[in-house]
Amino acid sequence: STDHVVDELERSLKDALDVVTAALDAGGVVAGAGAIEIEIADQIRDEAAGIEGRKQLAVEAFADAVDVLPRTLAENTGMDPIDALVDLRAEHDAGTTAGLISEGQTGIIADPIEYGVLDPAAVKREAVESATEASTMIVRIDDVIASN
């Protein structure tokens, strides 16, 4: 009935507004579509260049792990993941915001902000913090095992 449709529409609108409010209260939004992950991975790789020995390899491996989301997005949109990552890095090196946008049956590299593909900053921050904690624990466990 019409009343049911209106009620459902009101609930959906309220849910959408709650999501927006939560995102803004928690520090806003960041570009989605893997754009922020590419930038984070690039920053990690830049830092890795100044680290010597095995630690550098561990830091680079962490950067590779951060690239998993854009790589998966590329695969899911039918793009070659290696070519997509190379192109994304080139765009970011040129100073543009670029992500993997699903357009119909294919994927394109474009500015996710222009396409309205945004992620809550708090969610991304929490994901990076959790991944960092997990990586640190793995390295510590590996050090303990290696010392025995």
PLM-predicted stretches and their roles:
Residues 2-148:
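Extended, low-charge hydrophobic alpha-helical regions
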